[in-house]
């Protein structure tokens, strides 16, 4: 065991995966914990954290955990459910399911600064009308051009969630909805990360809907392909 989360200010419930840098440092998120004054949960269990685990310098030594950011349910969002990804410059990207200025979730960037400090930047705040999607549960993927691709588990024109792309445009980002899930038969509630093939096509899953009736009105879920 490398680290046991203690809840409270340490963080709790790491639901997403990890990413590793060239030095062997691990980066990840916790869904809760951190700031105990967070208002996203009524029982004040915290809005989540982004953390690193540094490899010990000596064999058999302890890994050192450090929080990079504590989510506050302010403009920085809340409850990062997916893991982080890392670009060629070492910046980290992820999603927060809730919070932010409109309460519908965010896409964020963590950028390392001098002195070991990390700066949290919200690069997209999902709108309150839900048309671009809301509540992103999954992490992101990154292509060679620096575009980010992801899913929102709900919202969109039919309420079943969306697939989206964020393209860097100078110091800002351009957001595009690639697909709106409609429920039956194409699925709803995409909750896991996407993958690419060599041609740039996207593949993923939805938790609900599809043509199968064995799971009742919600459906049993789907596997999908999208051609960007």
Where are these regions (language model features)?
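Extracellular beta-propeller repeat domains
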Residues: 1-228
């Amino acid at each position: 065991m490398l680290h046991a989360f203690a809840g409270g200010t340490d963080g709790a419930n790491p639901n997403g995966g990890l990413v590793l840098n060239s030095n062997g440092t691990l980066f990840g998120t916790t869904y809760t914990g951190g700031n105990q004054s967070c208002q996203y949960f009524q029982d004040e269990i915290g809005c989540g954290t982004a953390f690193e685990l540094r490899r010990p310098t000596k064999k058999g030594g302890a890994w050192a955990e450090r929080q990079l950011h504590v989510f506050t349910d302010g403009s920085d969002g809340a409850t990062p459910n997916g893991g982080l990804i890392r670009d060629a410059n070492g910046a980290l990207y992820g999603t927060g399911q809730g919070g932010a200025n409109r309460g519908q979730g965010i896409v964020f960037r963590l950028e390392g600064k001098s002195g070991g400090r990390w700066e949290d930047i919200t690069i997209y705040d999902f709108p309150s009308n839900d048309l671009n999607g809301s509540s992103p549960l999954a992490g992101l993927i990154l292509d060679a051009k620096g575009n980010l691709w992801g899913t929102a588990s709900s919202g969109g024109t039919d309420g079943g969630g969306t697939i989206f792309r964020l393209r860097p445009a100078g110091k800002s980002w351009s957001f595009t909805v690639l697909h709106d899930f409609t429920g039956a038969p194409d699925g709803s509630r995409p909750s896991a990360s996407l993958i690419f093939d060599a041609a740039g096509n996207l593949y993923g899953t939805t938790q609900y809907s599809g043509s199968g009736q064995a799971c009742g009105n919600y459906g049993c879920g789907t596997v999908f392909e999208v051609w960007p």
